[in-house]
Design a protein with these regions (language model features):
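N-terminal export signals
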Residues: 5-24
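Extracellular, repeat-based ectodomains that mediate carbohydrate processing or recognition
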Residues: 30-473
Length: 473
């Protein structure tokens, strides 16, 4: 695979889309805007501890920690006494909360709760509390999500916690559960097998009667060589996994190498390159940007670092590139992502990824344009954090970047995403860091809704909230 030089990759990361670029929006389409419409409190005393520079209730890679379905919104978190709970409300109403029979086992921010809806039978599914070990799974009775007004919200609506998916064991080293609904209404579960730096991505699928393991689709093997050294093991970190309106499954990713010898300094992080793959057969086979098959789920040929045509934005491991950031697709089915790292103008070697990202990290909007080319625009907002930024597109394809601390920047499709500016500076939230976006609510009722937890110290519990912003009508 061709790779850019150290200097070239870093400078390319700081490149800005020319001002004459244009989007697909009509001139009459409104630009981006947000209007804060309300804040609700889920829990005045949610569990709080800082782990991996994040919180277990607010890791932006949760899919989903907050979701909307058929006029109701659902949220999941851990309380101060470590109980896993799930709440619901009719949109605009008050929250009702139930415990699901599980307590958080470790002070590890990876051990998030993720929710998904199987539209085929109206169940709510939850996986939780795992970091390269066993997971806990809970599902509701059938029809609960289809008739929320007619079915009471009680613990009896949920089955007992399980260590398998209804008997399907998957793996003893399970991390990063992400649920996604297929166009037919089946529910898929994306997860990592094994460990950071030596793991594989896999899929399972629920058809309304049973779970099936579709298998692994990314490879941990092969040799990657940087300017500094080589690595023979890695894992693929997904920026997301999402179906567009035409049924194509998209995934941006970055690689994390096992061997720190690929870095200029051991205080950095071995993430490198932004890659992209897609699937037109519900995740069974994967294609690179050119349309060439590069992997088969459950087969011997998996997506590997040595495959050509995967990298859509090259960057070596010396710039503290973040993993598991964010992605979305626009109304034409074109993929967009947010990636972030320390641009080359701040130096060619990060030595402490937390402090360097906090001091000099920047987020970039990466997208495929109408011509099929990849464009990248630096968002002129300092991260002021080591953490992740989330991406949302409104009905007019305007882009919104939700930064740590709940700050919102946006750019118009009409400008070709060159007019980024802050719309909300996070004032009054007192948010700790990353926020959890309700991706489904943007489509459901044109509201940007996100969950955030207030700052605290030590292990002192703090309040967990949901804030709502109206987007352009």
């Amino acid at each position: 695979m061709r790779r850019r030089t150290l200097l070239g990759a870093a400078l390319a990361g700081a490149a800005v889309t020319p001002a004459f670029a244009f989007g697909t929006a009509r001139a009459a389409d409104p630009g981006p805007s947000v209007r804060r419409t309300g804040t609700t409190t889920l829990d005045s005393q949610a569990v709080f501890f800082v782990s991996y520079d994040g919180l277990v209730n607010n890791n932006s890679f949760q899919k989903n920690g907050l979701l909307t379905y058929k006029g109701y919104q659902y949220a999941a978190w851990y309380t101060a006494d470590r109980n896993a709970v799930v709440a619901r409300r009719v949109l605009g109403g008050t929250w009702s909360t139930v415990q699901v029979g599980h307590t958080l086992k470790a002070d590890d921010s990876h051990n998030v709760i993720s929710m998904g809806v199987s539209k085929v039978d109206g169940r709510l599914h939850l996986t939780m509390d795992s970091h390269s070990d066993g997971f806990t799974y809970v599902k509701s009775v059938a029809g609960l999500m289809d008739n929320p007004a007619g079915l009471s919200w009680t613990p009896a609506r949920f089955g007992a916690p399980q260590s398998t998916l209804d008997g399907l064991a998957l793996t003893t080293q399970f991390t990063y559960p992400q649920f996604v609904s297929t166009p037919e209404g089946r529910l898929q579960l994306s997860y990592r097998v094994a460990i950071s730096g030596n793991g594989r991505n896999a899929l399972a699928e629920y058809d309304g009667s049973q779970w099936t393991a579709l298998g692994e689709w990314s490879s941990s093997t092969g040799t990657y060589t940087s300017e500094h050294g080589s690595s023979t093991a890695r894992n693929m970190y997904l920026h997301g996994i999402d179906y567009d309106g035409n049924g194509r499954l998209h995934s941006f990713f970055t690689w994390r190498e096992q061997n720190g010898a690929v870095m200029c300094n051991g205080g950095g992080i071995t993430n490198h390159d932004t890659g992209y793959v897609y699937s037109d057969d519900r995740g069974r086979t994967w294609r690179n940007n050119a349309g060439t098959v590069v992997g088969t789920t459950g087969g011997s040929d998996k997506v590997a670092v040595t495959d050509t045509g995967l990298v859509v934005d090259a960057l070596n491991p010396d710039h503290s590139l973040m993993n598991q950031e964010s992605q979305a697709t626009d109304s034409a089915g074109r993929p967009h992502a947010i990636i972030s790292y320390v641009p080359g103008r701040f130096g060619q070697c990060t030595t402490n990824y937390v402090s360097d990202r906090t001091a000099n990290g920047r987020a970039f909007h990466l997208r495929k344009n109408a011509s099929g080319n990849w464009q990248k625009t630096e968002i002129p907002v300092p991260l002021n954090s080591s953490q992740r930024t989330k991406l949302v597109l409104d009905r007019y394809d305007n882009a919104y970047a939700i930064f740590p601390f709940g700050r919102i920047a946006a750019a118009s499709a009409a400008s070709g995403y060159t007019d980024w500016k802050i719309l909300f500076d996070g004032s009054g939230l007192n948010a700790f860091g990353e926020v959890v976006i309700d991706e489904s609510r943007v489509e459901a009722d044109n509201v940007l809704s996100f969950m955030y937890q207030e700052k605290s110290s030590g292990t002192t519990p703090s309040a967990l909230h949901v804030v709502d912003f109206a987007l352009p009508a």
